[in-house]
């Protein structure tokens, strides 16, 4: 640990004083830029943030529109900065990249970019990069309520653009600095507006003051409560995808991800703990963190600010904004500043002020640029050697190619392909049928990913098991493979499969009605992940649909076609629309969802049940309520909200937990309770939920909500799984307590499970073997009803990630999904979030089934 021990209290008090009285721009510049010695140090034509905004930085929270306007103002007054809008957030706020470099570099920026790109091409010599500028990426406020860094972004950009110092001019000649000034504008404005709304004058430092205590969902996450710092690999959010596209245009040499942590901490920067390093990443990459750390330490030493390194934070997973660049030959760094969460707050170090937190972030940012310029040659060598070593590492792998794809699920196949292309991974079409590891893949519906490629390490991250690391104390998830989560068939081949042409863009969705106007019915195979979207669109237009609870084969215009259990049947008779109007409605849903609709001329099947069978059941139109508010796990309920909004296009009501006993529940067919604490729900609300379930409602719970539902007798008759073992009361070292507690955490493990594919909740799941994400310690006993345990974790499970032996024994054989029939309704209990982080499509389709088929899953009804 490196811990600088100069007294920090006088600096905090000085910053607190600065809050209480207006400061001239010159005085504020002296506070944030103590290295600038006089007023002539800056170009007077370039406005300071204070001059433009009308208030001193740190005296209030800057809204995103103001931040955007300031960066645009800088571009009006200087030829050293260009501002590009690369996208918009879900709430419509601009996403920016600001490029800061010397004017002469801007004049040849594309030439510089192309020259720099030779570093990531193993076939190009190191000399091809020449003396091109080093590329630095500064990413701010990915967690919206870690607010100091976006304020620091304005000051850092101002300094680089306006400083007249010879050193700064050298930096701009030898560096291209990319600013992502607010990666999460929706969350940041949520936090900024709260802090501004509850600010007092004079400011209150009481940690219990409302200014410091954000309500649900807080500003950490984006509009859909996504943790964007864990979305760099999955890229589920439109906030994430544009910046990754820019990342791959530039491949920065250094990337800093600015964060905040608890108020009683100091400042953290890497190197990270050696036990948290990925074996996929060359040791030289991690060693360079130590080189860059010298410049961060120097910057904070000059301020007398406390800091530490080498503790706490993982550094092995490409899901993070500081580790994703490590997987591309850059030096990625997480920095963490103790957060004031308001203008001033009491801490163990004294009064912690907003300006003080901002100043540390400015110092680290400028120290990063200084370090990158000074170490440019070594950084170029590092990146060149990284991609060359990727080919050598790939050659040593037993698996030579990965194949993926499912002819019956083009939607998820296409989605996984799109993700790979976003990461610049080489993918080729499968031009001949192959069987790999017992799985069959057809030409035209599957793809090949060669392992021998420059992006090998990212290929491994997506398809292979997360390699074990030395540590067993984790900050976040312990496994991150994407392919198992998608639920699409994939396999690794020990022999190289060449494949056909390289894929440069995903194919367009082939949504259409095949065969013209139907005389009897239309049918959609439920195995296509987008079938649910088509169903929601049809029901939204008043079209009634049915679901076949058993497979059938029938004649179509394309010949005999087999449909899996769960497939949709839309009869022509009895609809509010007829003839051409019904055809156009069905065709519109097919085009929008990208699914194929078959035309049926008869209700008689070639094989399996006929279309008039009791096994072809009428579907009710779902009316869904999502419970979200204080106590609810925001990221979990946000994933359900995202699934309904963005995947199904199905509207949902958002209820506060305290509303459950006050609003009429009978309007809802489905209520979803994600993980969280529901102890605040009173007995009146519990009784209302019980009556609603008994009358035919379907209550969907997961994680701690499932535990709560069992304890409240909402899922009467069900039992929790093995309780955690009693604590070992033998004597332990005081200093080991955090590590011991962390070892027993369950945090993001991929486990193998068995799924009953004949159950309505599992319709569309292609195989009995299912990967599930285990994220908590809740376990469920299999149901006493033999037909009601839908998913059960294997005994023993195959584990991808770290899971202690004690926890392996606890989860083995437990139920992961079961149905508890209660009167005319039911409670659908998941042990974990089935839509985890918005990319677990292999299990979020179980939640989709619970929404559409929830009234049809009780054993007596299903076999009635």
Predicted regions and their residues:
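Carboxylate/His-rich catalytic cores and anion/metal-binding grooves
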Residues: 157-160, 174-202
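Intrinsic-disorder/low-complexity accessory segments
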Residues: 28-176, 224, 230-231, 236-242, ...
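Aromatic- and acidic-residue-enriched carbohydrate-binding clefts of CAZyme catalytic domains
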Residues: 208-226
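Short, solvent-exposed turn/loop segments enriched in Gly/Ser/Thr/Pro and often Arg
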Residues: 181-185, 195, 258-266, 705-706
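Bacterial N-terminal signal peptides that target proteins for export
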Residues: 1-11
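Boundary at the C-terminal end of the N-terminal hydrophobic targeting segment
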Residues: 20-29
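Active-site cavity-forming subdomains of large catalytic enzyme subunits
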Residues: 193-213, 233, 239-240, 252, ...
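Bacterial N-terminal signal peptides
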Residues: 10-20
